[in-house]
Structure formats: structure tokens, C-alpha cells
Amino acid sequence: AVISMALFTIGYTTTTSFGTYFFKYAFKDEGMYGVFAAILGVAQITALVIFPAISKKISRKTFYTLGTALVLAGYVLFFLSPMSIVPIGIAGVLIFVGEAFIQLLILMFLSDTIEYGQWKLGKRNQAVTLSVQPLINKLGGAVATGIMTATLLVSGINSAKTPDDVTSEGLMILKLAM
């Protein structure tokens, strides 16, 4: 559960950290980031609301697979999308609905770890187990910041004054890092 949570946090934070850079330098309309973020917010909240209904019908393993498939499909669509808000928006919805499902499932997996520990060892160590989550969130944020910083330097975005100053190779580096 801890490794899954760490990878999820790094991926999620890396993707969201690049949002404004993508819309400014690749999409070339920084103002559309607000629209995109609103779409993602509604998608993620909707996913969190429908989670209980879906979780009653399918197993956690199937649900995790579904969430992962949605995220992967969203990333592929995002990478292949032309610079149009409709396909990019659809890709974002797929990514953030899948991530919302995974986020809740990881919390359930942590809870399962606590229950298993109590069953197996006769001790309930929820404080220790749950204290790992903030540590993972901080480490994930730090790794994501490192990825973002390296990407902005290597892609040339850091020194670009305008979106037109970024080469097509630099934009490809940005999309790959996201």
C-alpha cells in the first residue's frame, strides 16, 4: 500500500504541477487553465460521490484496475491530443476520475493494512500506519518538484519569455514529463 501510495502521489503531483506551464507554453492560452481546472474539479468530485455506489458492485481489485485503466487512457489521449480543449478536457476527466477512485482505494488499502496487522500480530498500530501518509505526501511533492524543475530547465521553458520561444522538442519534453 505504501509503494502504491508513493507512486500515486508522485504521479498526481507531477501532473498537476505542470498544469499552468502546459497551458501557457504548449496550449498558448494560460487563461484556459482555469476552465480546465474547473472541469477536473467537477470530474473528481463526481467520481468521489459515485465511488460508494460503484464499490458495492465490483471488487476492490477490479475497481483499482478500472481506475488505473482510466488514468492510462487519459494520459494516452492527452499525449496524442491536438491543442484543442475538448480532447484535452476529455483526457483530463479520464485521468482525474481514475485518480479519484485510486485515491480512495489507497486509503481503504491502508485501513486494510491496519486490520491485517491487528489480526496477524494482535496489535492495532493505526497511528504509526496512518502517520506514513503525510510523509509520503511530502516526499511525493518533493520528487514532483524535482521532476518539474528538471523538466523546465531541460525543455527551455525556464528561460523562455514567450510561448513561441519554446521549441517543439521542449514541448515534447514537457508532455512526456507530465
Predicted segments with their positions:
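Membrane-embedded alpha-helical bundles of multi-pass transporters/translocases
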Residues: A1-M178
